[in-house]
Amino acid sequence: MPDYAIGDVQGCYDPLQRLLELIDFNEKEDCLWFVGDLVNRGPDSLAVLRFIYSLPVKPKITLGNHDLHLLGLLFGGQPWKGHDDTLEEVMLADDGEELGHWLRKQSLLCRSSELNIVMCHAGIAPLWDLSKAMDLANELEAVLSGDSYHEFFAQMYGNKPDIWSDDLVGLDRLRVITNYFTRMRYCDAHGRLDLGYKGTLSKAPNHLYPWFEVPCRKEIEMDIVFGHWAALMGRSSHPRIHAIDTGCLWGGQLTALRLQDRQRFSVPGYGVSRFE
């Protein structure tokens, strides 16, 4: 009964099915861990959601920024972002709201002591140890799954605050927690988020670091599995930090990481790379 962490699917239903065939997935025994961004940009977000929702073994899911965007559209009155969105089919589906309520009750962080794994969409803020990250994930999850979710989704967007402080309260506190867990790529040497630059490591401004290389980063005693960052193409500088967004939608692959032995499996995705 292996566990597999799956990279950013982003509505790519056919590659997901090919990947599951490659790993000889047994839906009655195996457990899938989805790193987030189940939806958007790809052609089949509704099919992806329906498939994952129907799995007999409950999957572990950490929410990504595109998942939160869908929830903002469904429940927060957020406007369409533009031509890149491919969420209309979900919005118009008879079961779209039901799927949305299921999605908003998923996690920001999943962990397994047995597998020595912690998973989140974008990463763990350099300023947090694992205990802090777990507490803050629980805090935000309580809002997403609780009665005040409409208010949060209506106001979740924004790049400020851009650094964690224990003194933060209210929406500012929830927004920075959200941005670290779901949007983070680069930080400065003090752990301050930079949400502007999204390019390759080789062209990054000198003052920015990948979140997992920030000099002040607190050590996490478990292996970290994350997605979100297709430009890394599955590579990180740390042997215990596993990047599994391999650009399925951008000329890359869709990747599964078997958590028992950290072996990778990949199938071709769609499109032409925008990172060349």
UniProtKB/Swiss-Prot annotation:
Enzyme nomenclature, EC number: 3.6.1.41
Gene Ontology terms, MF aspect: bis(5'-nucleosyl)-tetraphosphatase (symmetrical) activity
First-level EC class: hydrolase
Source organism superkingdom: Bacteria
Reaction it catalyzes: P(1),P(4)-bis(5'-adenosyl) tetraphosphate + H2O = 2 ADP + 2 H(+)
Family the UniProt entry places it in: Belongs to the Ap4A hydrolase family.
Role, per record: Hydrolyzes diadenosine 5',5'''-P1,P4-tetraphosphate to yield ADP.
Name of this chain's protein: Bis(5'-nucleosyl)-tetraphosphatase, symmetrical
Organism field: Legionella pneumophila subsp. pneumophila (strain Philadelphia 1 / ATCC 33152 / DSM 7513)
